[in-house]
Regions:
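Alpha-helical transmembrane segments and membrane-interface helix-loop junctions
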Residues: 1-166
């Protein structure tokens, strides 16, 4: 169980850390876009679209890592006062009842969304926009998978924490 948890968490963290570099590219593209717009009055649908595509990929690919690092939004009013075992129970049931079903539905629907986009050859509706819209849409099932894998790691860690005698 420990090896599986470690494997899941290392995989999610590596992908999250790699995805975090997308923020640098987003900043560079936005700065270049603003410079071109205000200096030369040149705008591009493709540059605007790549900005939000990269942001979407960053958000989806790093969400599992954010959960691993406990950086997701949480209402800590009660949680912070709980014992380690009570926190483990909350994490276990929260992951089983809320997180994994959400990831499952997001994965299945996102996969169908991506497949349909690929099958119809979906491109940007904007002139000069990006082709192959299925590429960004594929980030949805991938992101849901990563978030779900981290959820499984949390479940395993919670079970271990519950079973350990204080």
């Amino acid at each position: 169980m420990e090896q599986l948890t470690t494997l899941l968490e290392k995989s999610v963290a590596q992908i999250g850390k790699l995805a975090s570099w997308l923020s640098l590219f987003i900043v560079i593209i936005i700065v270049a876009d603003v410079f071109m717009r205000y200096t030369f009055s040149i705008t591009s649908s493709a540059s605007f679209e790549i900005e939000w595509h990269l942001f979407g990929a960053l958000f989806l690919l790093a969400s599992g890592w954010a959960l691993q690092e406990d950086k997701h939004v949480r209402v800590d009013v009660f949680y912070q006062k709980f014992s380690t075992k009570t926190k483990a129970w909350v994490n276990l049931f929260g992951s089983l009842i809320l997180l994994l079903p959400f990831c499952y539905v997001g994965f299945i629907e996102g996969l169908q969304f991506t497949i349909t986009s690929y099958q119809i050859g979906e491109t940007s509706p904007d002139p000069g926009g990006l082709p192959a819209r299925f590429v960004i849409k594929s980030m949805i099932p991938i992101g849901m998978l990563l978030l779900g894998l981290q959820g499984i790691a949390i479940i395993l860690k919670s079970i271990k924490a519950i079973l350990v005698n204080d």
